[in-house]
Amino acid sequence: MHAGVTGGVHRGGKRRLRNLLLGVQLFICWVFISLAAALYLQSDKTGRTLFGTLSLEEKEQILSIPMDFSFMNAVQKQDLIHQFKNLSGVEEVLPADINYLGGVSGTGMYTEKDNKGSYVDVNVMRITSGFFRFMHIPMRSGHTPRESSDLVIDEALSHRLGTDIMGKPLYNFDGDAYTVKGVCQTFVSSVYYDSEGFIFLLSGFDDYCGHCYIKCKEGQAETVFQEVRKILKKTLPESVEVKVSTFMDDIRESQALEFKLRGIVLFFSVVVLVISLLGVYSAVTIDTEYRRKEMAIRKINGAGMRQIVWLFARLYVTLLTVTAVLGFALVEFLLRQFSTLYTVFFQHGVAFYFCLFLSASLFVALTVAFRIWQVSRVNPAEEIKRE
């Protein structure tokens, strides 16, 4: 009798330890799955927000080409751009002095001439006349710049300067005057800080061109990509690396934190999920084998499939719920810290966690149900005879 009691205590201790370890596995699983989903949702959010006047599909159809070649003069670069324009799959070409994700043409202008106290901290971009059409940026009032002395500001700067800014001059560091001719939608080039606003000035880029964007016709991006590379390889010295990417590639590179990290976290999420499911399958197998006789007696006494399932499933329902609450609490804390890095962040409310809980619980439920279904097919009379 003493040996039986000791054996029962020993088995109970092992079962509690097993359940504890399984709970730890599920907790880790919830954390990784939640973080993977969060990173994918946030990367999608930032990808859509940056230069949000363009769709994700349009960003994939725009090629981005660095042209900061010290060995080429402005005329040679213009000739290179002309070759790009002549490609059959090209819809439009947009020269720039810098990658739009890498900085701006300048900063700051004055609202009053020769008055340093009127300085306004703002991003200044040189653009061509086709910039607003290329980027699908709508005008809120006025019109796009038509003369070299015209400028356009975005809504973020308009709110800072006041609604009566239209038609008024702004001055550069040399005292040259530019007249505000229009206000466009806020230009978003970063999700890490709130924009001070943008000023857009006309330029022909005859003096300097450090970058070029090519908008491809629908379905022609890959063909144009290869043709552009051929032109660059033919034109550039062999020692210069040919670099051609898409606008979306540039965004992924600038948002490396979420775009690169999400793949790593997703991989570990899959690994942890598989390990957790194997742990659940192993645990329910041991439980069903240990309680086969009890299950047989219950079936003889009229217990249905629902009662048999609940006999084993309630432990895993409890484990799933408790570990999910703890895991989601940790993830919510991490996401709130993470969100302070961004000006925009995806919605991670109750619906986010509820969908995650349903998705992961479905895998666990199928695992448990499959094993219980296998055991429930056993003839109870034969099982009792065997015992």
Residue ranges and their predicted role:
Residues 1-68, 362, 379-387:
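Alpha-helical transmembrane segments of integral membrane proteins
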Residues 272, 293-340, 351-355, 359:
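Transmembrane alpha-helical interface segments in multi-pass membrane proteins
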Residues 119-198:
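Hydrophobic secondary-structure segments that place a key small or acidic residue at a functional site
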Residues 1-11, 278-317, 377-386:
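Intracellular coupling helices
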Residues 74-92, 155-159, 174-262:
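"Rare, low-scoring activations can occur
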Residues 40-119, 124, 216:
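Membrane-proximal extracellular/periplasmic loop immediately following the first transmembrane helix
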Residues 16-42, 259-293, 321-327, 362-366:
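Hydrophobic alpha-helical transmembrane segments of multi-pass inner-membrane transport and secretion
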Residues 13-20, 24, 267, 321, ...:
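Conserved transmembrane alpha-helices of multi-pass membrane proteins
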